[in-house]
């Protein structure tokens, strides 16, 4: 091992050496980035540093200069991190700005007055979200997520592809100074001066959602608050987290947190002052088991010779200016470098091979620790790390993401070739025939093989047609329609059908390759397979009532009885694009599922939001940090502020809701009248100026009726389904749920007026074609009529309907015209609503 320190390997400018706060090595191990008090990010060549450390003669003096020096920050650079895919470099500063850098492959001349730089890095994104210094940055192992933490107590999650802000957590009560990702891509952990470490679990099925898995307090109860950073590290096998600035009694230590149980049974004790940083070596090592005696028996030596186990190595450093290397097989450090720097150590970084360790300090020095081959142990291949992570459901392919446009083009080209190959192979035989009749089909296919004929040969009678005539199940063609005689599956013939194979002989005598018409295999063999009397959808009976459309469903249920007229009509409704056929329904949007959905925001609307099919403008409040509701007149004005504690993506996480409940604040005439906390996510709200109450609907189907002074007027109402819009009229409250049901209550009398009135009869009253449900209209608005205590609905197609409770149905409201003819009077009398509703 060698400890190397170069005088030029620092942030030196105008006879001053600046403190260095951060260091990181690129995934390919060729570059190392540093940042410090001078506000610059410097990129150095690792190969040049290794060559200089080896003392090679003839080394160019230009190698003593950084490859690039970027100065876009207006404050000190506190953290830099390369993305695991190597495409980006993220940097954070005390100017509260997060910059995303990318290397420009084009050659650019150096600016006036600057030294010639070998690389040019440009800012691709400038992200502003923190309210104070950014202290640490970490990327997900697949580069899909970026997390930043800072002195504003916030944890901000960014999209690693487009760098949009996904979520902001303000769960810590003090400065957040460290963050690290799980190598298995399941968790990330943060360390804060509130003397806690929080483990966040994230799910990437569809929309990314986050939950707080565990809050760890015990190792940090007496943790000092004097460190600049709390840079923690996760072991490469995913089993342990090393957290600096912990305590074990009165002694400073580094806590080792076990995965899953999240307890701390191991502490690394040895530093005289609080530690700032801990870094696991990215490689796992094999080491021989120590022999107890030097003169042991040969049998014992043979047994222990091949007995190897995996070990991980961790480096710790901090304010005592010392560096310690620990290994999992020993209780004491294997190496300690005292006073390796003159001031506190701020950051460390291993290269991907695990044989070089970079250490930065406040004395503006950068120290390199270079280890010889197998000095730390025998490193296992990098694939061995993935094998260790398999226990957590991780494989190498789970980290594969499109890295560039060229990769997407190559994948598209491969997919096109694959389709062509499948199309050419499908002309020989069908996969279903092979599965049903493997032996008989092999015999028959030999007789159906078609080879190119000579120009002198004639095409007369084909063998498959003769076989077809010999079949017991004859195909009878009558009036241009085909019929298949019903046959039991036990007595079905074994000859393969060739009705879909057409061969055309050209004038030159050559035979064109048979063209296999692309049909549904189930249609072809439906005569042989038993089917239920009522067609059951492939996705289940529940899809019949949910209105879920499945492409090709009609063709599946019509069976094999398809004639030329049906084929012509089907072909007229098909549009060919890139070799595939799409029906008229394929060009429309998919149907909406009538199920509860966890996303109810206007800005994140998806096709499976059921309420969108019913109502044009919903009453769902926005998924923002604070929503303001207003009610009343100018003289008597009321406001209600709603602060949901969690986002809609985790609205059903009870633990997160109890940790961060929804806060409700009410104001009247400049005074706060309401302050309440509800462990539910509020999605809709409305106020009544007459009865002076607020109606708040939650994501789990509850409705809270609270007065303007915060009292709960009636027990909360449980509908079991989300409310998408509320309307207040006098003392009455009318709501529409996501399943299209109306409910109405008289809040003053505390009784129900309307319940379970479905909107579907007037929405889905158009003729249904086949098995598809098509909704082309929605509700423009609805209102409550106080005189008759009923509901009136106005659709977007300028038609209005009224609910008649005594009839138990809807009635369309016709416009009244002046009576001129007797026939018109008769028509109006027949179509109008009964006399007691004539006021409408």
Swiss-Prot record:
GO MF, one annotated term: nucleosome binding
BP-aspect Gene Ontology terms: negative regulation of chromatin organization; negative regulation of transcription by RNA polymerase II; negative regulation of transcription by RNA polymerase III; nucleosome assembly; transcription elongation by RNA polymerase II
Keywords: Chromatin regulator, Nucleus, Repeat, Repressor, Transcription, Transcription regulation, WD repeat
Segments annotated as WD repeats: 15-54, 72-111, 129-168, 171-210, 224-267, 292-336, 340-381
Presence of keyword Cell cycle: no
Subcellular location: Nucleus
Keyword Cell membrane attached: no
GO cellular component, one term: nucleus
Family: Belongs to the WD repeat HIR1 family.
Function description: Required for replication-independent chromatin assembly and for the periodic repression of histone gene transcription during the cell cycle.
Protein name stated in the entry: Protein HIR1
């Amino acid at each position: 091992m060698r400890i190397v320190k170069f005088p030029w390997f620092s942030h030196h400018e105008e006879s001053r050496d600046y403190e260095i706060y951060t260091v990181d090595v690129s995934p390919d191990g060729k570059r190392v980035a540093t940042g410090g008090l001078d506000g610059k990010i410097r990129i150095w060549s690792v190969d040049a540093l290794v060559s200089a450390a080896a003392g090679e003669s003839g080394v160019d003096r230009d190698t003593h200069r950084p490859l690039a020096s970027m100065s876009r920050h207006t404050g000190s650079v506190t953290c830099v991190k390369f993305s695991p895919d190597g495409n980006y470099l993220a940097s954070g500063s005390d100017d509260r700005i997060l910059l995303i850098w990318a290397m420009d492959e084009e050659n650019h001349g150096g600016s006036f007055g600057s030294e010639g730089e070998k690389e040019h890095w440009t800012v691709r994104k400038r992200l502003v979200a923190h309210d104070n210094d950014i202290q640490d940055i970490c990327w997900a192992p697949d580069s899909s997520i970026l997390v930043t933490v800072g002195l504003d107590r916030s944890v901000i999650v960014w999209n690693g592809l487009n760098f949009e802000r996904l979520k902001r957590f303000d769960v810590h009560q003090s400065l957040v100074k460290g963050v690290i990702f799980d190598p298995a891509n399941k968790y990330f952990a943060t360390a804060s001066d509130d003397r806690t470490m929080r483990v966040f679990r994230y799910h990437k099925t569809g929309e990314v959602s986050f939950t707080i898995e565990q809050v760890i307090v015990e190792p940090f109860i007496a943790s000092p608050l004097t460190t600049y950073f709390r840079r923690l590290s996760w072991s490469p096998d995913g089993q342990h987290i090393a957290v600096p600035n912990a305590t074990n009694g009165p002694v400073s230590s580094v806590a080792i947190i076990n995965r899953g149980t999240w307890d701390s049974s191991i502490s690394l004790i040895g530093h005289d002052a609080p530690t700032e940083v801990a870094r696991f070596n990215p490689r796992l090592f094999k080491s021989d088991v120590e022999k107890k005696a030097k003169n042991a028996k040969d049998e014992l030596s043979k047994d222990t010779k091949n007995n190897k186990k995996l070990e991980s190595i961790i480096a710790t450093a901090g304010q005592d200016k010392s560096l310690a290397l620990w290994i999992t097989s020993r209780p004491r450090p294997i190496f300690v470098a005292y006073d390796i720097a003159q001031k506190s150590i701020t950051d460390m970084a291993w290269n991907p091979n695990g044989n070089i360790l970079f250490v930065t300090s406040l004395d503006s020095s950068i120290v390199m620790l270079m280890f010889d081959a197998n000095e730390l142990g025998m490193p296992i291949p990098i694939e061995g790390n993935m094998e260790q992570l398999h226990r957590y459901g991780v494989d190498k392919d789970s980290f594969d993401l499109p890295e560039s446009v060229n990769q997407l083009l190559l994948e598209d080209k491969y997919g096109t070739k694959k389709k062509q190959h499948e199309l050419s192979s499908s002309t020989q035989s069908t996969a279903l025939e092979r599965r049903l009749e493997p032996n008989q089909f092999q015999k028959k296919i030999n007789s159906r093989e078609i080879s190119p004929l000579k120009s002198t040969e004639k095409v007369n009678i084909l063998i498959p047609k003769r076989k077809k005539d010999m079949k017991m199940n004859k195909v009878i063609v009558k009036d241009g329609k085909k019929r298949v005689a019903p046959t039991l599956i036990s007595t079905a013939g074994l000859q393969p059908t060739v009705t879909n194979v057409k061969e055309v002989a050209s004038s030159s005598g050559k035979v064109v390759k048979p063209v296999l018409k692309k049909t549904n295999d189930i249609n072809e063999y439906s005569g042989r397979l038993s089917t239920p009397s009522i067609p059951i959808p492939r996705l289940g009976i529940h899809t019949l009532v949910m209105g879920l459309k499945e492409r090709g469903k009609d063709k599946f249920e019509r069976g094999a009885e398809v004639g030329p007229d049906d084929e012509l009509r089907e072909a007229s409704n098909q549009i060919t694009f890139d070799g595939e056929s799409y029906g008229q329904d394929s060009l429309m949007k998919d149907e909406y599922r009538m199920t509860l959905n966890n996303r109810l925001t206007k800005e994140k609307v998806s096709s499976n939001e059921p309420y969108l099919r019913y109502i044009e403008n919903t009453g769902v409040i926005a998924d923002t940090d604070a929503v303001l509701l207003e009610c009343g007149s100018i003289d008597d004005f009321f406001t209600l502020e709603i602060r949901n504690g969690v986002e809609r993506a985790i609205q059903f996480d009870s633990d997160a809701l109890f940790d961060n409940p929804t806060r409700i604040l009410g104001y009247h005439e400049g005074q706060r009248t309401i302050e309440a906390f509800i462990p539910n996510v509020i999605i809709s709200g409305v106020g009544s100026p007459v009865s002076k109450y607020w109606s708040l609907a939650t994501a789990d189907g509850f409705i809270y009726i609270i007065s303007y002074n915060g009292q709960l007027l009636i027990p909360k109402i449980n509908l079991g389904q989300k409310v998408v819009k509320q309307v207040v009229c006098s003392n009455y409250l009318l709501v529409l749920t996501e399943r299209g049901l109306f409910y109405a209550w008289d809040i003053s009398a505390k009784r129900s007026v309307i319940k379970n009135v479905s909107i579907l009869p007037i929405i889905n009253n158009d003729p249904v074609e086949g098995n598809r449900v098509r909704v082309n209209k929605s509700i423009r608005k609805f209102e409550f009529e106080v005189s008759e205590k009923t509901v009136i609905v106005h659709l977007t197609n300028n038609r209005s309907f009224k609910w008649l409770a005594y009839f138990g149905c809807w009635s369309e409201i016709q416009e009244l015209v002046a009576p001129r003819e007797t026939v018109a009077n008769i028509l109006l009398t027949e179509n109008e609503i009964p006399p007691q509703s004539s006021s409408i």
